[in-house]
């Protein structure tokens, strides 16, 4: 195999029935881009990779998300966004998170209580690296559904292990 082809993707997932869009979404918007309040039909986690994004929701009223931060918005939340600078982020949409470790999941449910004030979480270096890699993958072509499912499991594993 020639060296040039080793660095190029060999599989075209665009025609595959398992191809998927909309679960992990990489978005870039210029300063001033506004998204009026809209009800979330799924849970979502927003990971800010670059820039600042003003979030207005019941959980995060008037919260500025900065590079390296992330938040969870639940189903039914009304979410409004405003790019305060050029912004680059990833959104993970899901109804139920993939169940990675049932024991840890039950521990989290038993130990967690709703905070008085919600604050953004800071990405670990592992999640930051994961996000950079997933952005590269999403930029190549139509994502493979099976691969995205695995990456969503990996992402939830990282969140469950480190938060």
Provide a role label for each language-model segment.
Residues 1-19, 118, 137-143:
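A short, N-terminal "cap"/entry segment at the start of jelly-roll beta-barrel domains
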Residues 18-112:
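N-terminal regulatory/effector-sensing and dimerization cores
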Residues 12-14, 68-72, 96-103, 119-124, ...:
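Short, functional N-terminal and low-complexity linear motifs
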Residues 3, 12, 94-97, 124-128, ...:
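General structural signal for secondary-structure boundaries
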Residues 31, 37, 120, 141-142:
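Residues at structural and domain junctions
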Residues 6-7, 11, 62-84, 122-139:
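Short, charged N-terminal helix-start/capping segments
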Residues 121-163:
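An amphipathic alpha-helical interaction segment
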Residues 104-131:
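Aromatic/histidine-rich interaction motifs
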């Amino acid at each position: 195999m020639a060296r040039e082809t080793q660095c190029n993707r060999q599989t075209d997932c665009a025609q595959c029935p398992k191809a998927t869009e909309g679960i992990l979404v990489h978005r870039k918007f210029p300063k001033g881009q506004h998204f009026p309040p809209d009800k979330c039909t799924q849970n979502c986690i927003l990971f800010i990779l670059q820039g600042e994004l003003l979030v207005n929701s019941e959980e995060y009223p008037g919260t500025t998300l900065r590079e390296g931060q992330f938040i969870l918005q639940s189903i039914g939340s009304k979410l409004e966004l405003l790019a305060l600078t050029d912004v680059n982020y990833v959104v993970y949409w899901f109804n139920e998170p993939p169940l990675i470790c049932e024991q840890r999941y039950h521990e989290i449910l038993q130990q967690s209580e709703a905070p008085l004030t919600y604050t953004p979480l800071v990405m670990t270096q592992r999640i930051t690296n994961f996000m950079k890699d997933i952005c590269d993958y999403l930029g190549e072509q139509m994502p493979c559904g099976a691969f995205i499912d695995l990456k969503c499991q990996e992402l939830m594993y990282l969140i469950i292990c480190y938060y």
